[in-house]
Regions:
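Conserved beta-loop-beta element that borders a ligand/cofactor-binding pocket
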Residues: 157-167, 189-219, 238
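NAD(P)-dependent short-chain dehydrogenase/reductase
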Residues: 181-182, 204, 209-269
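NAD(P)H-binding glycine-rich loop region in Rossmannoid oxidoreductase-like domains
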Residues: 41-143, 147
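N-terminal Rossmann NAD(P)H-binding glycine-rich loop of SDR-like oxidoreductase domains
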Residues: 2-31
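Mid/C-terminal beta-alpha module of Rossmann-like enzyme folds, strongest
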Residues: 15-16, 271-332
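Catalytic loop of short-chain dehydrogenase/reductase
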Residues: 103, 109-115, 122-134, 159-183, ...
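SDR active-site strand-loop-helix element
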Residues: 11, 35, 82, 163-169, ...
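Active-site Tyr-X1-5-Lys
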Residues: 142-150, 169, 177-203
Length: 332
Protein backbone atom coordinates (compact mmCIF):
# COMPACT_ATOMS: atom_id res chain seq x y z
CA UNK A 1 0.00 0.00 0.00
CA UNK A 2 1.01 3.58 -0.64
CA UNK A 3 1.71 6.05 2.21
CA UNK A 4 -1.40 7.46 3.80
CA UNK A 5 -3.00 10.52 2.22
CA UNK A 6 -6.49 11.69 3.06
CA UNK A 7 -8.77 11.89 0.05
CA UNK A 8 -12.55 12.02 -0.04
CA UNK A 9 -15.06 11.34 -2.78
CA UNK A 10 -18.09 13.63 -2.68
CA UNK A 11 -21.17 12.25 -4.41
CA UNK A 12 -22.88 15.36 -5.74
CA UNK A 13 -19.89 17.64 -5.24
CA UNK A 14 -21.17 20.31 -7.61
CA UNK A 15 -24.37 20.82 -5.62
CA UNK A 16 -25.20 23.30 -2.87
CA UNK A 17 -23.99 21.21 0.08
CA UNK A 18 -21.55 19.08 -1.89
CA UNK A 19 -19.60 22.11 -3.07
CA UNK A 20 -19.32 23.38 0.51
CA UNK A 21 -17.92 19.99 1.54
CA UNK A 22 -15.37 20.09 -1.30
CA UNK A 23 -14.26 23.60 -0.37
CA UNK A 24 -13.97 22.82 3.34
CA UNK A 25 -12.10 19.57 2.76
CA UNK A 26 -9.52 21.33 0.60
CA UNK A 27 -9.05 23.95 3.31
CA UNK A 28 -8.34 21.12 5.77
CA UNK A 29 -5.61 19.71 3.53
CA UNK A 30 -7.56 16.83 2.03
CA UNK A 31 -7.60 15.78 -1.59
CA UNK A 32 -11.06 15.87 -3.13
CA UNK A 33 -12.84 14.11 -5.99
CA UNK A 34 -16.46 14.55 -7.00
CA UNK A 35 -18.94 12.63 -9.10
CA UNK A 36 -22.18 13.97 -10.54
CA UNK A 37 -24.35 13.21 -13.58
CA UNK A 38 -22.87 16.14 -15.50
CA UNK A 39 -19.32 15.99 -14.17
CA UNK A 40 -19.18 19.76 -14.45
CA UNK A 41 -17.26 21.86 -11.89
CA UNK A 42 -19.26 23.91 -9.42
CA UNK A 43 -20.02 27.54 -10.20
CA UNK A 44 -21.56 30.30 -8.12
CA UNK A 45 -25.16 31.30 -8.89
CA UNK A 46 -23.72 34.12 -11.01
CA UNK A 47 -21.56 31.73 -13.02
CA UNK A 48 -18.21 32.46 -11.38
CA UNK A 49 -15.57 29.76 -10.80
CA UNK A 50 -13.60 30.26 -7.55
CA UNK A 51 -9.93 29.26 -7.46
CA UNK A 52 -10.53 26.26 -5.19
CA UNK A 53 -12.68 24.60 -7.86
CA UNK A 54 -9.60 23.84 -9.95
CA UNK A 55 -8.16 21.72 -7.12
CA UNK A 56 -11.06 19.24 -7.23
CA UNK A 57 -11.14 16.20 -9.51
CA UNK A 58 -14.51 16.46 -11.27
CA UNK A 59 -15.86 13.19 -12.67
CA UNK A 60 -19.05 12.26 -14.47
CA UNK A 61 -20.79 9.37 -12.77
CA UNK A 62 -24.16 7.90 -11.83
CA UNK A 63 -24.54 6.81 -8.22
CA UNK A 64 -26.78 3.93 -9.31
CA UNK A 65 -24.20 2.69 -11.81
CA UNK A 66 -21.08 1.58 -9.88
CA UNK A 67 -19.08 1.02 -13.05
CA UNK A 68 -18.98 4.81 -13.53
CA UNK A 69 -17.12 5.49 -10.27
CA UNK A 70 -15.88 2.22 -8.73
CA UNK A 71 -12.38 2.87 -10.08
CA UNK A 72 -12.14 5.98 -7.88
CA UNK A 73 -12.92 4.26 -4.58
CA UNK A 74 -9.64 2.42 -3.87
CA UNK A 75 -7.85 5.77 -3.62
CA UNK A 76 -10.22 7.46 -1.17
CA UNK A 77 -10.31 7.29 2.61
CA UNK A 78 -13.91 8.50 2.94
CA UNK A 79 -17.04 8.87 0.83
CA UNK A 80 -19.63 11.62 1.39
CA UNK A 81 -23.11 11.16 -0.07
CA UNK A 82 -24.82 14.56 -0.45
CA UNK A 83 -27.52 14.01 -3.07
CA UNK A 84 -31.22 13.85 -2.24
CA UNK A 85 -34.50 15.65 -2.71
CA UNK A 86 -36.88 17.41 -0.33
CA UNK A 87 -39.81 17.26 -2.74
CA UNK A 88 -39.83 14.42 -5.23
CA UNK A 89 -40.23 15.29 -8.91
CA UNK A 90 -41.26 18.85 -8.07
CA UNK A 91 -38.68 20.88 -10.01
CA UNK A 92 -37.97 23.00 -6.93
CA UNK A 93 -34.18 22.60 -7.07
CA UNK A 94 -33.73 24.17 -10.48
CA UNK A 95 -36.01 27.05 -9.49
CA UNK A 96 -34.06 27.53 -6.26
CA UNK A 97 -30.73 27.49 -8.09
CA UNK A 98 -31.97 29.99 -10.68
CA UNK A 99 -33.47 32.27 -8.02
CA UNK A 100 -36.86 32.04 -9.73
CA UNK A 101 -39.25 32.81 -6.87
CA UNK A 102 -42.57 32.27 -8.73
CA UNK A 103 -41.45 28.90 -10.12
CA UNK A 104 -40.03 27.86 -6.74
CA UNK A 105 -43.29 28.68 -4.96
CA UNK A 106 -45.28 26.93 -7.69
CA UNK A 107 -43.10 23.81 -7.51
CA UNK A 108 -43.28 23.57 -3.72
CA UNK A 109 -47.03 24.23 -3.68
CA UNK A 110 -47.58 21.51 -6.28
CA UNK A 111 -45.46 19.07 -4.29
CA UNK A 112 -47.29 19.81 -1.03
CA UNK A 113 -50.65 19.50 -2.79
CA UNK A 114 -49.70 16.16 -4.28
CA UNK A 115 -48.13 17.15 -7.58
CA UNK A 116 -49.70 17.01 -10.99
CA UNK A 117 -48.60 17.39 -14.59
CA UNK A 118 -47.12 20.79 -15.33
CA UNK A 119 -47.87 22.61 -18.57
CA UNK A 120 -44.34 24.03 -18.55
CA UNK A 121 -41.95 21.71 -20.47
CA UNK A 122 -38.91 23.04 -18.59
CA UNK A 123 -40.58 22.29 -15.28
CA UNK A 124 -41.55 18.80 -16.45
CA UNK A 125 -37.93 18.10 -17.42
CA UNK A 126 -36.57 19.33 -14.08
CA UNK A 127 -39.10 17.13 -12.30
CA UNK A 128 -37.92 14.11 -14.26
CA UNK A 129 -34.30 14.79 -13.35
CA UNK A 130 -34.95 15.29 -9.64
CA UNK A 131 -36.44 11.81 -9.24
CA UNK A 132 -38.20 10.06 -6.39
CA UNK A 133 -37.51 9.82 -2.66
CA UNK A 134 -36.70 6.13 -2.93
CA UNK A 135 -34.24 6.62 -5.77
CA UNK A 136 -32.38 9.72 -4.61
CA UNK A 137 -32.60 9.60 -0.82
CA UNK A 138 -32.20 5.86 -0.31
CA UNK A 139 -31.17 3.77 -3.32
CA UNK A 140 -28.27 5.96 -4.47
CA UNK A 141 -26.77 6.00 -0.97
CA UNK A 142 -27.12 2.25 -0.51
CA UNK A 143 -25.60 1.52 -3.91
CA UNK A 144 -22.62 3.81 -3.34
CA UNK A 145 -22.05 2.37 0.13
CA UNK A 146 -22.17 -1.19 -1.21
CA UNK A 147 -19.63 -0.33 -3.88
CA UNK A 148 -17.39 1.45 -1.36
CA UNK A 149 -17.38 -1.54 0.99
CA UNK A 150 -16.44 -3.84 -1.88
CA UNK A 151 -13.44 -1.73 -2.88
CA UNK A 152 -9.91 -2.57 -1.80
CA UNK A 153 -7.95 0.49 -0.61
CA UNK A 154 -4.59 1.18 -2.21
CA UNK A 155 -3.68 3.63 0.56
CA UNK A 156 -2.78 2.58 4.08
CA UNK A 157 -5.26 3.77 6.68
CA UNK A 158 -4.87 3.77 10.46
CA UNK A 159 -8.53 2.97 11.05
CA UNK A 160 -11.84 2.26 9.35
CA UNK A 161 -12.73 4.20 6.22
CA UNK A 162 -15.77 6.47 6.65
CA UNK A 163 -19.03 6.59 4.73
CA UNK A 164 -20.86 9.82 5.53
CA UNK A 165 -24.53 10.10 4.63
CA UNK A 166 -26.35 13.43 4.67
CA UNK A 167 -29.62 12.58 6.36
CA UNK A 168 -31.95 15.06 8.09
CA UNK A 169 -33.67 16.02 11.31
CA UNK A 170 -37.34 15.05 11.29
CA UNK A 171 -38.71 18.59 11.40
CA UNK A 172 -40.54 19.08 8.11
CA UNK A 173 -43.71 17.00 8.20
CA UNK A 174 -46.46 17.39 7.13
CA UNK A 175 -45.37 20.31 4.93
CA UNK A 176 -42.78 18.01 3.40
CA UNK A 177 -44.28 14.58 2.62
CA UNK A 178 -43.35 11.87 5.12
CA UNK A 179 -41.66 9.91 2.33
CA UNK A 180 -38.72 12.29 2.62
CA UNK A 181 -37.73 11.44 6.18
CA UNK A 182 -38.86 7.82 5.86
CA UNK A 183 -36.46 7.14 3.00
CA UNK A 184 -33.67 8.96 4.84
CA UNK A 185 -34.15 6.72 7.87
CA UNK A 186 -34.43 3.63 5.67
CA UNK A 187 -31.09 4.50 4.09
CA UNK A 188 -29.51 4.87 7.54
CA UNK A 189 -30.77 1.45 8.62
CA UNK A 190 -29.55 -0.29 5.46
CA UNK A 191 -26.16 1.43 5.53
CA UNK A 192 -25.65 0.66 9.21
CA UNK A 193 -26.44 -3.00 8.63
CA UNK A 194 -23.77 -3.20 5.92
CA UNK A 195 -21.15 -1.35 7.96
CA UNK A 196 -21.77 -3.41 11.09
CA UNK A 197 -20.72 -6.46 9.10
CA UNK A 198 -17.40 -4.92 8.06
CA UNK A 199 -15.03 -3.60 10.73
CA UNK A 200 -12.92 -1.80 8.14
CA UNK A 201 -15.64 0.82 7.71
CA UNK A 202 -17.68 3.20 9.83
CA UNK A 203 -20.80 5.17 8.97
CA UNK A 204 -21.82 8.66 10.06
CA UNK A 205 -25.29 10.11 9.53
CA UNK A 206 -25.35 13.90 9.53
CA UNK A 207 -28.87 15.14 10.35
CA UNK A 208 -29.08 18.88 9.70
CA UNK A 209 -32.18 21.02 9.94
CA UNK A 210 -32.89 23.65 7.26
CA UNK A 211 -29.56 24.43 5.55
CA UNK A 212 -29.08 28.01 4.44
CA UNK A 213 -26.56 30.39 2.89
CA UNK A 214 -27.46 34.09 2.50
CA UNK A 215 -25.66 34.48 -0.83
CA UNK A 216 -25.97 31.10 -2.55
CA UNK A 217 -29.56 30.43 -1.41
CA UNK A 218 -31.02 33.89 -0.71
CA UNK A 219 -34.62 32.69 -1.07
CA UNK A 220 -34.19 30.46 1.97
CA UNK A 221 -32.70 33.16 4.21
CA UNK A 222 -35.99 34.79 5.37
CA UNK A 223 -37.40 31.42 6.41
CA UNK A 224 -34.14 30.56 8.17
CA UNK A 225 -34.22 33.86 10.07
CA UNK A 226 -37.80 33.27 11.24
CA UNK A 227 -37.06 29.72 12.35
CA UNK A 228 -33.96 30.85 14.21
CA UNK A 229 -36.05 33.51 15.99
CA UNK A 230 -38.66 30.91 16.90
CA UNK A 231 -36.00 28.59 18.33
CA UNK A 232 -34.52 31.45 20.36
CA UNK A 233 -37.91 32.46 21.78
CA UNK A 234 -38.74 28.88 22.72
CA UNK A 235 -35.36 28.40 24.40
CA UNK A 236 -35.79 31.48 26.59
CA UNK A 237 -39.42 31.12 27.66
CA UNK A 238 -40.08 30.91 31.43
CA UNK A 239 -40.46 27.44 32.90
CA UNK A 240 -44.08 26.34 32.88
CA UNK A 241 -45.07 28.94 30.31
CA UNK A 242 -47.10 27.36 27.46
CA UNK A 243 -45.54 27.51 24.00
CA UNK A 244 -46.74 26.53 20.52
CA UNK A 245 -44.18 23.72 20.41
CA UNK A 246 -45.29 22.44 23.81
CA UNK A 247 -48.90 22.35 22.67
CA UNK A 248 -47.92 20.47 19.53
CA UNK A 249 -45.97 17.91 21.53
CA UNK A 250 -48.98 17.39 23.79
CA UNK A 251 -51.17 16.77 20.77
CA UNK A 252 -48.56 14.43 19.37
CA UNK A 253 -48.46 12.41 22.58
CA UNK A 254 -52.20 11.81 22.29
CA UNK A 255 -51.87 10.25 18.86
CA UNK A 256 -51.31 6.47 18.64
CA UNK A 257 -47.83 5.52 17.48
CA UNK A 258 -47.66 3.60 14.21
CA UNK A 259 -46.65 -0.01 14.72
CA UNK A 260 -46.09 -1.29 11.20
CA UNK A 261 -44.94 -0.24 7.77
CA UNK A 262 -42.68 2.62 6.84
CA UNK A 263 -44.38 4.99 9.30
CA UNK A 264 -42.80 3.06 12.18
CA UNK A 265 -39.62 5.00 11.41
CA UNK A 266 -41.07 8.36 12.44
CA UNK A 267 -43.26 9.85 15.16
CA UNK A 268 -46.29 12.14 14.97
CA UNK A 269 -46.37 15.08 12.51
CA UNK A 270 -47.17 17.28 15.53
CA UNK A 271 -43.79 16.39 17.03
CA UNK A 272 -42.14 17.14 13.71
CA UNK A 273 -43.69 20.62 13.58
CA UNK A 274 -42.67 21.20 17.20
CA UNK A 275 -39.06 20.48 16.26
CA UNK A 276 -39.07 22.94 13.38
CA UNK A 277 -40.16 25.62 15.87
CA UNK A 278 -37.49 24.78 18.43
CA UNK A 279 -34.46 23.50 16.49
CA UNK A 280 -32.72 26.32 14.59
CA UNK A 281 -31.52 26.14 10.97
CA UNK A 282 -27.84 25.66 10.19
CA UNK A 283 -25.39 27.37 7.85
CA UNK A 284 -24.14 25.17 5.03
CA UNK A 285 -20.52 25.79 6.02
CA UNK A 286 -21.17 24.38 9.50
CA UNK A 287 -22.62 21.21 7.99
CA UNK A 288 -19.62 20.92 5.69
CA UNK A 289 -17.23 21.36 8.61
CA UNK A 290 -18.96 18.57 10.54
CA UNK A 291 -18.76 16.31 7.49
CA UNK A 292 -15.04 16.91 7.09
CA UNK A 293 -14.34 16.26 10.77
CA UNK A 294 -16.30 13.02 10.48
CA UNK A 295 -14.27 12.09 7.39
CA UNK A 296 -10.94 12.71 9.11
CA UNK A 297 -8.94 9.50 9.55
CA UNK A 298 -8.08 10.43 13.14
CA UNK A 299 -11.73 10.72 14.23
CA UNK A 300 -12.57 7.05 14.40
CA UNK A 301 -14.79 7.90 17.38
CA UNK A 302 -17.25 9.68 15.11
CA UNK A 303 -19.96 7.17 14.25
CA UNK A 304 -23.73 6.97 14.01
CA UNK A 305 -26.31 9.78 13.81
CA UNK A 306 -25.52 13.41 14.52
CA UNK A 307 -28.43 15.79 15.04
CA UNK A 308 -28.07 19.56 15.25
CA UNK A 309 -26.76 19.71 18.83
CA UNK A 310 -24.29 16.92 18.13
CA UNK A 311 -23.15 18.67 14.95
CA UNK A 312 -22.50 21.84 16.94
CA UNK A 313 -20.60 19.89 19.56
CA UNK A 314 -18.54 18.21 16.86
CA UNK A 315 -17.44 21.50 15.28
CA UNK A 316 -16.91 23.25 18.61
CA UNK A 317 -19.84 25.62 18.24
CA UNK A 318 -21.46 26.64 21.53
CA UNK A 319 -24.61 28.67 21.84
CA UNK A 320 -24.37 31.46 24.41
CA UNK A 321 -26.36 30.89 27.55
CA UNK A 322 -27.21 27.30 26.72
CA UNK A 323 -25.62 23.98 27.42
CA UNK A 324 -25.58 21.28 24.81
CA UNK A 325 -28.59 19.03 25.31
CA UNK A 326 -27.05 16.12 23.48
CA UNK A 327 -23.75 14.31 23.61
CA UNK A 328 -21.92 14.15 20.29
CA UNK A 329 -22.81 11.02 18.44
CA UNK A 330 -25.91 10.23 20.52
CA UNK A 331 -29.02 9.21 18.59
CA UNK A 332 -31.62 11.90 18.04
Amino acid sequence: MQPFAQKILVVGGNGFLGSAVCRTALARGMKVASISPSGKPWQTPKGHTPAWVHKVEWHQGNALQPQTYAHLLPEVTAVVHTIGTLFEKSGYKSALKDGNVPRFVSSVAAAVAGGGVSANPLERESKRREGSYETLNRDTAVRVCETFLQSEPVVKTDGPRAFIYISAEDCNRPIVPSGYIETKREAEVLIEKMVQENARYRAVYIRPTLIYHPHFRPMITPAAALLDLSATIHSKHPAGFPTPAGLLRTLGSLMPRPVSGRESLVDSPFNSIARVLTVPPIHVDHVAEAVCIAADKSRTDVRGPYGLEAIRELIGWHQKGQKSQQQAGAPV
